[in-house]
């Protein structure tokens, strides 16, 4: 019985440490050399690629057409995200360990933050942020309402949330 209790305690501590270490860094999405309609960003763990479907826009602020391509360097897996709304170019973040990609997706008046497993493209967590200003930083997720400007700092009401749900195990 002590062995079982010890195993549960170790699992709990491991999950708690994972949640506590859940931080995301914004990924700069830039034009890819040699391919005028491809944009992407990368770090040592993962590469994220978008296709720009508008040949007249060489500096898009969003990518309206799936898929998004993920190349996970740690596992060697590549995958495609086929579902999604419009992906915001400035709304792509990577987890510190490279296992999660967090993206801002929107369509019409609805908006979500969605995290994906970088090796499988499975959804880890999604959060509806419709009608709110948002920011991801070292302190977590900040959501603002009653805003006078475009940034979350212009909001009269700001709620802080943990990023831990975005780092959990991918949903099946």
Curated annotation (Swiss-Prot):
Gene3D superfamilies: 2.40.128.650
Keyword Signal listed: yes
InterPro entries named among the record's database cross-references: Tsi1, Tsi1-like_sf
UniProt KW keywords: Disulfide bond, Signal
Stretch forming the signal peptide: 1-19
Bridged cysteine pairs (disulfide): 22-167, 79-121, 147-155
Pfam families, sorted: Tsi1
Subunit structure: Forms a heterotetramer with Tse1 consisting of two Tse1 dimers and two Tsi1 dimers. Formation of the complex inactivates Tse1 enzymatic activity.
Stated role: Immunity protein that plays a role in preventing early activation of toxin Tse1. Binds to a large surface of Tse1 and thereby occludes the active site to specifically inhibits enzyme activity by forming a hydrogen bond with the catalytic diad.
UniProt protein name: Immune protein Tsi1
